[in-house]
C-alpha cells in the first residue's frame, strides 16, 4: 500500500488498498 496514514475514509486510488487491507 502507498497510502502513508492508511486513512480508511480516503478512497483515492492510492489509498483503496488500505481499505481492502492490501499492500
UniProtKB/Swiss-Prot annotation:
Upon intracranial injection in mice, as25a (the toxin without the two 4-hydroxyprolines) provokes paralysis of the hind limbs and death with a dose of 240 pmol. Its main location: secreted. This is Conotoxin as25a. It is found in: Secreted. One of its GO terms (molecular function) is toxin activity. It comes from Conus cancellatus (Cancellate cone). The cysteine framework is XXV (C-C-C-C-CC). GO terms for cellular component: extracellular region. The name as25b given in PubMed:23474143 corresponds to the hydroxylated peptide. The amidation of the C-terminus of this hydroxylated peptide is not directly confirmed. The modification Proline amide is found at residue 23. The modification 4-hydroxyproline is found at residues 4, 23. It comes from the Eukaryota. Expressed by the venom duct. Keywords: Amidation, Disulfide bond, Hydroxylation, Neurotoxin, Secreted, Toxin.
Amino acid at each position: 500500500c502507498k497510502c502513508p496514514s492508511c486513512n480508511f475514509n480516503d478512497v483515492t486510488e492510492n489509498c483503496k488498498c488500505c481499505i481492502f487491507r492490501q499492500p
